[in-house]
């Protein structure tokens, strides 16, 4: 990819075999995201093992700060019926509670009799589950082996929890900053501003992140001004609410600072 102009194309690795599970750590390290393909995986391993493999892969992706998709047979009965079984509804909800970034339909929307209903049902279950329980907090990092971006992201999330902030707004070139913020379990929406359209599209996969393309934010003060504008118009934040703003100062490519402001002040 690098040699043919695709340096910024991201790789989603599909885990569908015992070999993939056995080598998961190495695959995760080289991947930008993971798809847990339960249907194919269930052909090769005992059915009773698949749920635990799914949980393991989601947990490791969360810890690495990389998106994970849970896929296959999530609402399988809706290929034939207009409503899912209660077990299927629970399956979708439990994947979200475990920390998956995305849930994916396949046959339900590709060849089923009720594709629109299946999509609406998955969206309804997802929204309700998010209302029940927000993100899970990952252990705060420590030691000299973590990056500045990760330390700042963790601190921003901890601050948002402590102060009951309503939004986190961050600036990103590559998408790394919002992924690291998501890793540490914020309970509020993450707004990512970027001047790169490809980065904005790629962030659509990251749970809790909404990305906007914003040009002309070359100076730190420009970012803070735009962040204030977005916060003032966001449905989750009212005048007087606190917002955490995360960006980089001086060194491009490094997220190294955050600050807290009140909406409308």
Identify the function of each model-found stretch.
Residues 1-265:
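Non-catalytic helical/linker scaffolds that mediate oligomerization, partner binding
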